[in-house]
Amino acid sequence: MELVRIFKEHNVFGWISVGTAVLSLLLLNLAIISNVTFYSYQMLPFAMAAVPFGVVELFIKRGRTGPGLLGVILNLFVIICVYTIVSVDTNLQFGF
């Protein structure tokens, strides 16, 4: 029960989500600067896996947390950007 209290008080899941989003954004910048699609493919699983952490944080704190919401928004932004970059670079039609 102590671990649950620590996770709840310190927004652990929200900060994990935000940290993953920041790392994904840095990798996204690297992919754009170097013009290599491979980096985009590497970052996508991290951004997709971090979204549930932010959602869990929102449910734990009942929507009163900044890191959880920020993590969800940033990771969804990363996922949309990655799909756009990959679809443009590889001439795939993802609907963008």
UniProtKB/Swiss-Prot annotation:
Induction: Cotranscribed with sigma-M and yhdL. YhdK and YhdL negatively regulate sigma-M.
Keyword entries, A-Z: Cell membrane, Membrane, Repressor, Transcription, Transcription regulation, Transmembrane, Transmembrane helix
Subcellular location: Cell membrane
Transmembrane segments: 12-34, 38-60, 67-86
Domain of life: Bacteria
GO CC terms of this entry: plasma membrane
Main location: membrane
Topology class, membrane: Multi-pass membrane protein
The UniProt record lists the keyword Transmembrane: yes
Transcription regulation listed as a keyword: yes
Subunit structure: Interacts specifically with YhdL, while the N-terminus of YhdL interacts with sigma-M.
Name the record gives this protein: Probable anti-sigma-M factor YhdK
Native species: Bacillus subtilis (strain 168)
